[in-house]
């Protein structure tokens, strides 16, 4: 990913870095205010992340990082891929980009005032369209890849909840079949679906849920923790029944198992972060009999431990798969380690520097293990992670 920005453009963009550091969130707030004057544009965004401010801070941080690296945008390649995948999930299309450009440049002018000269705005317009064109091109490739597969679709598709499976005190799985009776595009183990809940009386509410079953052309399974409040998880747990219709876009995401497994694999999860790991384990059990796999999971206790019996069954089917669970509230009769997963334990009980690590869990869990694994000598290219929510900074930072 190389850009041919002129030295003058680079100088102008970098001159705004101190101002973006100070006023970035104000600029993004003003940008969204302009965008959301159009209800059709507003509906594209996850309004929960708007209300709690996480998306505003995330985008402000991303724009600041872009400005700081305007002379070397290649360092943002992984972020570009994640954004493109997310845009496909949220059904964002090329025709939406001009609206963002107008709102962003207008917000920069409004907040920075006279500092935002015509030259500065022209430089930021050039920088915006460079990234926008990269995203549009990548999103087109992702969509084409989906549509060329049997069962592929674009936009929103209606699915029927065909089964509810209680997994723990707070976690339930939902089996989903397409209402139209057609096939579904097989996902890559680790990917997620994006749901909208307009029909449930929550317009603008969108959520990403990992697929927790192995790839197939018949159905998807999602496994959802009941969170506090009245959002999407509350609707699924308290109101959605067998026969309820929910809508989603096709599977996306850059966190998935490779088609060829060349190194030992360590799957590391905390809480409901186990969901993509179960999908990966099902895929490994089905298609990779010689893969060396260590699954390490942490949760509070037996009552919060979801899908334990299913995971044990998968391990029993695969001669090279091991699973260890840590309970922070372990009782004497529990078949689990006590306390928290540690780097020292992983170093002593897994291939460590020789392995590919796949991580999913709460933000503190991810931040700790991404940082500590790399700090302990695991190459960064062997540490893969999934996080749901705006990525306001790299986990290793």
Swiss-Prot record:
Heme b binds at residue 87. NADP(+) binds at residues 271-276. The record marks 86, 386 as: Influences the redox potential of the prosthetic heme and FAD groups. The keyword Transmembrane helix does not apply. SUPFAM superfamilies: Ferredoxin reductase-like, C-terminal NADP-linked domain (SSF52343), Globin-like (SSF46458), Riboflavin synthase domain-like (SSF63380). It is an enzyme of class 1 (oxidoreductase). Residues 154-258 form the FAD-binding FR-type domain. Transmembrane segments: none annotated. The record marks 32 as: Involved in heme-bound ligand stabilization and O-O bond activation. Keywords: Detoxification, FAD, Flavoprotein, Heme, Iron, Metal-binding, NAD, NADP, Oxidoreductase, Oxygen transport, Transport. Its cofactor is heme b; FAD. Residues 4-140 form the Globin domain. GO terms for biological process: cellular response to nitrosative stress; nitric oxide catabolic process; response to toxic substance. It catalyses: 2 nitric oxide + NADPH + 2 O2 = 2 nitrate + NADP(+) + H(+); 2 nitric oxide + NADH + 2 O2 = 2 nitrate + NAD(+) + H(+). The active site is at residues 97, 139. Residues 151-397 are annotated as: Reductase. Binds 1 heme b (iron(II)-protoporphyrin IX) group per subunit. HAMAP family: Hmp (MF_01252). Is involved in NO detoxification in an aerobic process, termed nitric oxide dioxygenase (NOD) reaction that utilizes O(2) and NAD(P)H to convert NO to nitrate, which protects the bacterium from various noxious nitrogen compounds. Therefore, plays a central role in the inducible response to nitrosative stress. NCBIfam families: PRK13289.1. This is Flavohemoprotein. The gene is hmp.
């Amino acid at each position: 990913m190389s850009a041919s920005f002129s030295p003058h453009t680079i100088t102008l963009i970098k001159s705004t870095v101190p101002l973006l550091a100070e006023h970035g969130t104000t600029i993004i707030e003003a940008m969204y205010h302009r965008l959301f004057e159009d209800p059709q544009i507003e509906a594209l965004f996850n309004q929960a992340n708007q209300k709690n401010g996480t998306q505003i801070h995330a985008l402000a941080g991303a724009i600041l990082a872009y400005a700081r690296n305007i002379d070397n945008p290649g360092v943002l390649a992984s972020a570009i891929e994640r954004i493109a995948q997310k845009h496909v999930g949220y059904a964002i299309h090329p025709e939406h980009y001009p609206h963002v450009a107008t709102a962003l440049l207008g917000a920069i002018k409004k907040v920075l005032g006279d500092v935002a000269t015509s030259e500065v705005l022209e430089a930021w317009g050039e920088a915006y369209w460079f990234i926008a064109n990269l995203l549009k091109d990548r999103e087109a490739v992702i969509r084409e890849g989906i549509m060329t597969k049997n069962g592929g679709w674009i936009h929103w598709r209606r699915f029927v909840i065909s089964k509810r499976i209680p997994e723990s005190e707070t976690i339930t799985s939902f089996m989903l079949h397409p209402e139209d009776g057609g096939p579904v595009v097989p996902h890559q183990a680790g990917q997620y679906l994006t749901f909208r809940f307009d029909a449930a009386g929550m317009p603008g509410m969108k959520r990403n849920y990992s697929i927790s079953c192995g790839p197939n052309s018949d159905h998807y399974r999602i496994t959802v923790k009941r969170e506090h409040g009245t959002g999407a998880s509350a609707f699924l747990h308290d109101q959605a029944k067998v026969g309820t219709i929910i809508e989603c876009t096709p599977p996306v995401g850059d966190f998935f198992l490779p088609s060829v497994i060349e190194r030992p694999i360590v799957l590391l999860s905390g809480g409901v972060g186990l969901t993509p790991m179960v999908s990966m384990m099902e895929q490994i059990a089905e298609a990779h009999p010689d893969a060396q796999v260590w699954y390490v999971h942490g949760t509070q206790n037996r009552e919060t431990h979801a899908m334990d019996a299913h995971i044990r069954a998968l391990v029993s089917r695969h001669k090279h798969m091991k699973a260890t669970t840590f309970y922070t509230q372990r009782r004497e009769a529990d078949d689990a380690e006590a306390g928290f997963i540690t780097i020292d334990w992983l170093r002593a009980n897994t291939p460590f520097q020789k392995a590919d690590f796949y991580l999913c869990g709460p933000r503190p869990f991810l931040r700790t293990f991404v940082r500590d694994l790399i700090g302990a000598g695991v190459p960064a290219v062997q540490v893969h992670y999934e996080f749901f929510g705006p990525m306001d900074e790299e986990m290793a930072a």
